[in-house]
Amino acid sequence: MDKIQKIPDSEVIYLTSDLHFFHDNIIEHCERPCTKEDHIDWILNKINSVVKPEDIVYHLGDFAYGSNAKFSSLQEVFSQLNGTWRFIIGNHDKEKQLEALCQGTPHEVLGEYHSFYYKKRKIVMLHYPMETWDGKGRGRNSIHFHGHIHNKKITEIENRHNVCLDNEHKVYLLDDFL
């Protein structure tokens, strides 16, 4: 069994999901306060106004909208984002495309599920919300972060958090949940 990574307490970590670059219908579907023409700039501003180049960003799925995302366009957008990005695969992601995007960079694709320890808490990440997760029964020591549901409301479960961009139109600082 692999040992779960411990992230240094000094790291600044942000969480987000479901950016849906190159998905025009998401603007209306999730009531994003922008137009088709300024959608990419709106997303970049939401991220870069908070995330610094030295920060870590975990993206929990659906970075771009499948076949709508031309690789060269995606590279151009990705090069403008602050932070070191770590990707969890979502239902609209093309894993090979994300891997190619990260090739030769400090960014990485982590697969469909990832967990680590940070400030004595177990952090569990998946694109989809889970009813239960590793460590959930151990009090407040384990926290699950997910995306997928955008701005839809689901039954609240202690220590389960939706970090979709559409939830509050922001990226989330992990420390705010600890």
Where is each model-derived feature located?
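A short acidic-Thr-Gly-centered motif at the start of a beta-strand
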Residues: 1-8, 133-137
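Core catalytic region of metal-dependent phosphoesterases/phosphodiesterases
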Residues: 6-7, 16, 21, 25-113, ...
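Conserved catalytic motifs of the protein kinase core domain
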Residues: 12, 56, 142
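Short, hydrophobic/glycine-enriched beta-strand segments
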Residues: 13-18, 162-163
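Conserved beta-sheet core of the metallophosphoesterase superfamily
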Residues: 103-178
